[in-house]
Amino acid sequence: MYLLNKTPLFLEFLKRFMNKAGYVFEDENIQNKLFLHSKCNCKQKDCATVYLYSKKPFKEDSTGINIFNTNKGYIIVHILDEGYFEFEALLYKKYPYKKEIDKFFNKNRKIDKKVPKLKNKIKKISDKDMKKIDDYFNDFEILEPNIIDLGEIDFNEINKKD
């Protein structure tokens, strides 16, 4: 596992998105609670999925899956009670942190259970990169979910056929 401090773009993106989505962290310094575990290896150009890990398992009432349909793509937050946290970002080629995460995990980094020593210092984000994040969130919207009404299902009717 690796410190979130090593990926300042992703850390800033994560903080801003989670704030907009209504998630509240007890500790504002989420970089001291969540660690980079790995990234998705699907190799799709529009996938920017990152897997995180928390030393302390999540409370049962905070676990689950939330799907956010945004004007910039889909973001799926999947929190598991074992301490894993999946931040799945799909269908948008310009997530500001994608290159940073790809580069970070492209160095043949091992996936291990060793939790790194905490450091408060976060790598500084360049003005250019901060502008990318600002531009991304400037017109960012969480849209109403796309729901398809399939009508009612009569489970009694299904049981009769079996």
Show the residue positions of the predicted features.
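N-terminal domain-onset segments
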Residues: 1-63, 99-162
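Amphipathic protein-protein interaction modules
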Residues: 45-101
